Amino acid sequence: MFRGATLVNLDSKGRLTVPTRYREQLIESATGQMVCTIDIHRPCLLLYPLPEWEIIEQKLSRLSSMNPVERRVQRLLLGHASECQMDGAGRLLIAPVLRQHAGLTKEVMLVGQFNKFELWDETTWYQQVKEDIDAEQSATETLSERLQDLSL
């Protein structure tokens, strides 16, 4: 399970160094093989260990290519999916088209989200966090039953 937000830097080749605390887990569970794709709702990237991505691919394969909405989701997620292999120094090369999509240049937030990571431009990440907190503080809708059961 991946959790927490960590500031990492992209080098001049577009590689990020995976924090040490995640490397062993990624080597054991995925032999360092990852898949990166776009988030279709937010300006960030999604980074999955290969076995987790294969589950997503199976679900995507069950969608209908005749349904325009389902086909669009398939096209966006699969069309942008890029395999990346963690090298001996714990680095992952993020494809240029993906870096451009999320506006990633130098400082990147690696955000653990259970079975995957989100990759955000640092400034965009902090703006999103502020928007999310503001939305929660001004929320008028009733919490879902699942959120009501979440006791913090």
UniProtKB/Swiss-Prot annotation:
The keyword Repeat applies. Keywords: Cytoplasm, DNA-binding, Repeat, Repressor, Transcription, Transcription regulation. InterPro entries: MraZ (IPR003444), MraZ_C (IPR035644), MraZ_dom (IPR020603), MraZ_N (IPR035642), MraZ_sf (IPR038619), SpoVT-AbrB_dom (IPR007159), SpoVT-AbrB_sf (IPR037914). Residues 5-52, 81-124 form the SpoVT-AbrB domain. It holds the Pfam family MraZ. Its main location: cytoplasm. GO terms for molecular function: DNA-binding transcription factor activity; transcription cis-regulatory region binding. It comes from the Bacteria. GO terms for cellular component: cytoplasm; nucleoid. It is found in: Cytoplasm, Nucleoid. Forms oligomers. Negatively regulates its own expression and that of the subsequent genes in the proximal part of the division and cell wall (dcw) gene cluster. Acts by binding directly to DNA. May also regulate the expression of genes outside the dcw cluster. This is Transcriptional regulator MraZ. It comes from Salmonella paratyphi A (strain AKU_12601).
